[in-house]
Design a protein with these regions (language model features):
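Active-site entrance/lid segments in N-terminal catalytic domains of soluble metabolic enzymes
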Residues: 1-170
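Glycine-rich beta-strand-to-loop/alpha-helix junction loops that act as flexible
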Residues: 172-174
């Protein structure tokens, strides 16, 4: 929690631009506390891939509201009926629950249009868009399955990834 607070605090120093963090969904243990620390420092964007971050939008909603947040936790060798959950209560970690926390925008990092479609339908909260990675993006050793839907003129190519807005953010002025 402290490390992410410091990283975001320092990243915000000296400018008025947006700051985001990229967390790996598969590294489950630190994510709840990491998100809280970053949000306390004024985080603008959360990007998550390396797994299916279906629960993260709701986690962001709950942390911003100073409520208990939970994530399912994968346990190797667990049976199908076992439910393992990580939980994080901001109040239990000394959070000032009267302080207003801004919920950061959430971008899911995906390598296939089927995953983007699944997240758009089944995510537990609101995602503002997707980063669609190509097969040569960092850490990938196999081509993406399916096709990458990048026909919309609003899509922006960033080398081996495309940023695709799921819903326009109408609260901002350009």
């Amino acid at each position: 929690m402290l490390a992410n607070f410091v990283e975001v605090f320092l990243a915000r120093s000296g400018h008025h631009g947006a700051v985001g963090i990229n967390l790996l969904t598969k590294l489950q243990l630190p994510n709840l506390a990491s998100l809280h620390g970053a949000m306390l420092a004024g985080l603008n964007y959360v990007l998550m891939g390396a797994g299916i971050p279906r629960e993260v939008p709701l986690v962001l909603d709950r942390i911003a509201s100073h409520e208990m947040a939970t994530l399912h936790f994968d346990v190797e060798g667990a049976t199908a009926g076992d439910a393992h959950v990580l939980s994080f209560d901001p109040a239990a970690h000394g959070a000032d629950v009267t302080r207003v926390l801004t919920r950061p925008q959430f971008l899911a990092i995906v390598a296939a249009n089927s995953l983007a479609a699944t997240l758009a339908r089944k995510a537990s909260g609101r995602a503002c868009g997707f980063v669609v990675e190509g097969p040569t993006a960092g850490g990938h050793n196999a081509p993406a399955r399916g096709t990458v839907p990048c026909r919309a003129p609003a899509n922006r190519s960033t080398g081996n990834a495309w940023v695709i807005a799921a819903r326009p953010n109408r609260s901002r002025t350009s």
